[in-house]
Design a protein with these regions (language model features):
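C-terminal lobe and pocket-closing loops
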Residues: 213-258
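Ligand-binding pocket segment of bilobal, Venus flytrap-like solute-binding proteins
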Residues: 68, 76-80, 151-231
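Extracytoplasmic "Venus flytrap"
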Residues: 25-41, 62-63
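A conserved helix-loop-strand patch within extracytoplasmic ligand-binding domains
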Residues: 99-151
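Short, polar/charged alpha-helical segment
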Residues: 35-53, 165-167
Length: 258
């Protein structure tokens, strides 16, 4: 975490080096996931305490944040947690136009799917395909609708779109898994509640993230990253994105930037 914090601060300083003054307020977008909110607050503290400026956090999803940055009217000037290639549909548009500049020092992020250690041991779950077993699906059905709940992310997340496709191409929908989109705070609460009640629950997870300190969870294995099996089209690129996408391997390590 110290390395990440140092990288973030260095990235922020280099990114803001072109700003002529901090007399005016710097508006930092907050896309709402736990890691992004933490980073946004860290960046705000750096601006306020180290750079003599004034920072304001502005909530919004990725589409709203990138749209505001692209308009260059001071509505939002910083995206605190850019995961690439997840968000490249936005960066590939804005960077060449000159309305978005990426920090020069990225750090790595790892994403996948998790269950609690308790649930993994109880049901002998180690890999993503284990979630397709009938007894596992049944154990993940908390509302009695016959579907096992699997949190894939929040509305507006590029990663949630990837996860929606992945679960399909891993055959989990056919096995009875139901993809759930909800705010990350809802997911965090559900993870803790499922452990307390001894229930099954699966969810999209990534590192770095606070969940690893909040609960005893394990990331499941997936087929190793295979570029031939990773063809993701985001809604911004094509309205028929879901049909045209095919993702059946683990994500490559991500480059995270400001």
């Amino acid at each position: 975490m110290k390395i990440i914090k140092t990288t973030l601060v260095a990235g922020l300083i280099s990114l803001f080096a072109t700003f002529s003054t901090f007399a005016e307020k710097v508006k930092i977008g907050d896309p709402g996931w736990t890691g992004a909110t933490a980073i946004a607050n860290l960046l705000a503290a750096v601006v306020n305490d180290k750079m003599g400026g004034e920072a304001e956090l502005v909530p919004g999803n990725n589409t709203a944040i990138y749209g505001a940055i692209d308009r260059s009217k001071g509505e939002i000037e910083v995206h605190p947690d850019i995961w690439l290639p997840n968000q490249q549909a936005y960066t590939n548009d804005l960077v060449p136009k000159g309305t978005l500049k990426l920090s020069s020092k990225p750090y790595e992020g790892n994403q996948g799917y998790c269950v609690s250690q308790q649930f993994a041991k109880k049901m002998n779950i180690t890999a993503i395909e284990d979630l397709a077993r009938p007894e596992v699906v049944k154990a993940m059905d908390s509302d009695g609708n016959g579907k096992g709940e699997f949190w894939i992310g929040a509305d507006g997340w590029a990663s949630a779109n990837v996860n929606q496709v992945k679960l399909r191409d891993y055959g989990l929908y056919d096995a009875g898994i139901e993809a759930i989109r909800a705010a990350e705070a809802v997911k965090n609460a559900r993870v803790l509640d499922s452990i307390k009640k001894g229930e099954g629950y699966a969810f999209y997870c990534y590192k770095p993230h606070a969940i690893w300190g909040m609960a005893d969870v394990v990331m499941l294995t997936e087929p190793k990253f295979d570029e031939a099996k990773y063809k993701m089209v985001q809604p911004k690129e094509d309205a028929d994105w879901y049909k045209k996408s095919y993702v059946a391997s683990k994500d490559a390590l991500k480059q995270i930037q400001i």
